[in-house]
Amino acid sequence: MLIPLARAVLALALLGAGAAHAERLKDLASIQGVRGNQLIGYGLVVGLDGSGDQVRQTPFTQQSLTNMLSQLGITVPQGSNMQLKNVAAVMVTATLPSFARPGQTVDVVVSSMGNAKSLRGGTLLMTPLKGADNQVYAIAQGNLLVGGAGASAGGSSVQINQLNGGRISNGAIVERAVPTMYAQDGTVYLEMNNTDFGTTQNAAAAINRQFGAGTAMALDGRVIQVRGPLDPSMMPAFMSQVENLQVARAPATAKVIINARTGSVVMNRTVMIEEAAVAHGNLSVIINRQNQVFQPDTPFTEGQTVVVPNTQIEVRQDGGALQRVTTSANLADVVKALNALGATPQDLLAILQAMKTAGALRADLEII
C-alpha cells in the first residue's frame, strides 16, 4: 500500500510542478488559416497649418489634388500652379483582421510620402484600401492623431518624436469580407509559435486528455492536427475549449542574442557557462590634431605665414589580467559571473563569442 501511495504522491507533485509553468494553448499556438491581411492605399491629408507638401518638389501631390477636385465637379485650369501648403500626400496602411465583416472598423496608420513637415491637425480624405489582389476591402477617412510635437522660430526648431506619421483609431470601415477557412471536414491544424518538439507534444497530449485519445496528433515540431466535430456550428465552441487548455512549455533552447549595433545582450534562463579563465584588454586609439601657425619674426620681409598640422597619436591598452569565471547553472549565477569581469556591453560581445568558441558557453549564440 505504501508503494502505490508514494507513486500517487510523486505523480501529483510532478503534475503540480508542470502546471506551475503551464500556459494557455492560445498563447503558444495559432490556428492555421486564421490570420490578418495587409491593406494599403494612397490618399491626401488636408487641413495642415502650413506644414504640408511643397508642390513644386512633390508634383504628385498637386496631380492627386487636381484629380480629386475633378471627381467632385471642380475643374482646375491646365497648367495652373497651385501654391498649396495645407495638403500632403500620404500612404495609408491597415490590417484587416480575420473574420472581419462589412461595417466593422479597423485602425489605420497614415505616413507622409512627400516633404511635409508635419501631419499634426490634418484630416485624411476618403481613401480606398486595397489588398494584394487589387480589390478594395476598406475605406479610410478621419482626423489624424500625431504623437509628436514641434515648433520652430528664427531658424531654430524643436521636435519631439515623429511628426510625419499618425494613426486614426477605427478610421477605416470594412467594405468586403475575406473568407476564412480554418476547418475542413472537422480537421483543424494548430501552428506553434516556436518550433519545439517537447511543447508540441505536450499540447497534443493535453488535447487528448481533454477530448479523448486520437483527437490530436503532432505532425512535426510545429504543427498539430486536431480532429473536431463534423458539424460546423459546433466548431467555435470546440476551438474555444482547445485554446484555453493549459499546456506545459518545454524548457527552451539555451540562447544568447547579441545586437552588434547597440551592444545589447539578452539571454534566457537556460543559459549555462562552464568554468573558464578570461582576459580581455581594452585597446583605445586617441588621435589629437592641432594646427600650429608659424609667422616670420621680422616684419616687412618676404617671409610667409605657414600653417603646420601637429598630429599626436596615442595607443592605450588597459586591463588584460586573467580572471576566473566559475561554473554557473542558472541565470542569476551567469549574470553574477559575467558582471564580475567588469566588462562593458561592447566588450561582453567579444567575450561571449570567445567563450562559445572555447566551449565554455552552453548556449546558441545569435548575432542580429
Curated annotation (Swiss-Prot):
GO terms for biological process: bacterial-type flagellum-dependent cell motility. It is found in: Periplasm; Bacterial flagellum basal body. Residues 1-22 form the signal peptide. InterPro entries: Flag_FlgI. One of its GO terms (molecular function) is structural molecule activity. Its main location: periplasm. The keyword Signal applies. Keywords: Bacterial flagellum, Periplasm, Signal. It comes from the Bacteria. GO terms for cellular component: bacterial-type flagellum basal body, distal rod, P ring; outer membrane-bounded periplasmic space. Belongs to the FlgI family. Assembles around the rod to form the L-ring and probably protects the motor/basal body from shearing forces during rotation. The basal body constitutes a major portion of the flagellar organelle and consists of four rings (L,P,S, and M) mounted on a central rod. This is Flagellar P-ring protein.
